[in-house]
Amino acid sequence: MKVIFTQDVRGRGQRGQIKEVPDGYAQNYLIKRGLAKQATKAAMSQLKGQQRAEEKHAAEELADAKRMKKILEDDNTVVELSGKAGTDGRMFGSISTKQIATALQKQFDLKIDKRKIELAAPIKALGYVNVPIKLHPEVEAQIRVHIAEK
């Protein structure tokens, strides 16, 4: 019997996959527990529609990420932050990803999750720093952050 898996089943199939399985296994285990449904023409066309919608959604996310990258990497986009520093240019505190995300929201009205900002260690020096941001698995942007003394 051909079934369409509605959930991942270890050792058998993944969600959205169409596979031939024994009749008894399909009726008594997979379909009964809601792990799969019978692969009828209606179910197959519904699955294809869902896959098209998911592809369209993924393409829109990628386009949004590319648009955001263009904005972030513009020469005019410099995130301005300030902090107290000593005479040698070292800060008393540090600048974290949360502060950078908040500054992006306030200065440029761009909402970026702080977890997407890839900062190896908090910034502890004054001046300009290039900070990478992972907008999408395929799109990474660099923003310039300027840390000035208060």
Swiss-Prot record:
Segment forming the signal sequence: none
Keywords: Ribonucleoprotein, Ribosomal protein, RNA-binding, rRNA-binding
Keyword match Repeat: no
Gene Ontology CC terms, in alphabetical order: ribonucleoprotein complex; ribosome
Family indicated by similarity: Belongs to the bacterial ribosomal protein bL9 family.
GO biological process, one term: translation
Keyword Ribonucleoprotein: yes
Cited PROSITE patterns: RIBOSOMAL_L9
Species: Limosilactobacillus reuteri (strain DSM 20016) (Lactobacillus reuteri)
Domain of life: Bacteria
MF GO annotations: rRNA binding; structural constituent of ribosome
Role played: Binds to the 23S rRNA.
Protein name: Large ribosomal subunit protein bL9
